[in-house]
Amino acid sequence: MIRPILKMGDSRLLRVAKPVQRFQTPELTALIEDMFDTMDAARGAGLAAPQIGVDLQVVIFGFDRNDRYPDAPAVPKTVLINPTIEPLSDAMEDGWEGCLSVPGLRGVVPRYTRLRYTGYDQHGHAIDRIAEGFHARVVQHECDHLQGILYPMRVQDFTRFGFTEILFPELPAHHND
């Protein structure tokens, strides 16, 4: 089921999410299915449970190709529950980000270029992966949602933050959301 996506300004997006306590429950399974339905319908690269009003540490991400980020490499489809992130170096890179909860805007955000993320899949099996580049950026962006952080809070240079249609006029109109 496609759920409504909360938008910046909704105070629920600023809450810290709670860890998932039980895996393989009908409720968790339904939540994850709804998250994928919602992300796919919105053509997103990822989605965090708080974006649909659920205060649980659940994020999903991944795509083969994403028309909102046409130059981005594929990212493996992942369900990540109760995640932790460990940067593998101090190296950071600026990159453009958008968000389904901040429609029509893009901004440049510094992110760690290489990291290790751990957590669990929907069955409670451990996940332990190394990510770099856009994959690492997506993981950090989605996990920020679990701490009540939206990407504009990380923008450092507001001359590089604005409406997608102005910043990227070459993108078709449907890329602006």
Curated annotation (Swiss-Prot):
Its EC number is 3.5.1.88. One of its GO terms (molecular function) is metal ion binding. Keywords: Hydrolase, Iron, Metal-binding, Protein biosynthesis. The keyword Secreted does not apply. It comes from the Bacteria. Pfam families: Pep_deformylase. Fe cation binds at C99, H141, H145. This is Peptide deformylase 2. It comes from Ralstonia nicotianae (strain ATCC BAA-1114 / GMI1000).
